[in-house]
Amino acid sequence: IRSVSDAPIHTIVYSHGHVDHAYGTWALLKDEATMAAGQPAIVAHRKVAERFAYYLRLRGMVARYMNQPPDHLPTSEEDFVWPTVEFDDELRLDIGGETVHLVHHPAETDDQCYVWLPDRQALYSADYYQGFLPNMGNGKRVQRGTDQWVIALREMADLGATAMLPGHGEAIVNSEMIRSELRILADALAHIIDQVVDGLNARLRKDQIVDCLNWPARFADHPTLAVTYVSPQDIARMVLKRWTGWWDDIPSHWSPA
């Protein structure tokens, strides 16, 4: 930041409440110019505060599933820098003469938003786009967004961005590539969701729906849909989790009357 401006930090936006996106704020607040100017506004979706509270309440479980020592995680409310400005669906800000548009859609988390700077045609896509098949199906995590993830991708594809900054990975500065990347990811996720819905309506068991999942070459061979973190089948399981209960459809696993 200091390589481009000496001005104090005016506003900090949390794209979502994950550790790698919201836990480093303390370093920004220690900046001398910012300290002299006063506390910046901390802007986030309303559910970010709920996420922080959840991390405190279930600290041991979170540590286990993140493969982290418990003492590496926050132990009190004072360990977080909490939002001071919250929003629900969307929020427009005017910061230093720049229009900043925040738009919320549940996806990687239920508190995630993307950031659109229309005057610069610049998009911060947060974790909606990750450069590989995204984390919609991690079996160690809580429910991910499904249809809303697809909606967000298609919205972003239609913005006409000439620069896209993902939450992870390299920037893309080609408008046609941005549009293409967002659209094929949306199509891939929608393809999985639609198959799960069709299987449920055909009254198939959950394991049958996953086992029968079709993953065409258009997606399987695409370099930014690589199976790096989760598989298409994992994503199908997360979609099933959204619409069904804990029962796996095997009669002997149902509690006897």
PLM region spans:
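Short, solvent-exposed loop/turn and secondary-structure capping segments
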Residues: 24-25, 52-57, 135-136, 176-177
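Active-site metal-binding motif and surrounding structural segment of the metallo-beta-lactamase
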Residues: 1-41
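Solvent-exposed loop/turn segments at secondary-structure junctions
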Residues: 17-21, 48-50, 109, 130, ...
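Metallo-beta-lactamase
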Residues: 48-200
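Accessory terminal helices/loops
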Residues: 60, 158-160, 171-257
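Active-site neighborhood of phospho(di)ester-bond hydrolases with catalytic His/Asp-centered motifs
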Residues: 10-18, 43-45, 123-126, 163-168
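Divalent metal-coordination and catalytic microenvironments
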Residues: 1, 16, 42, 87, ...
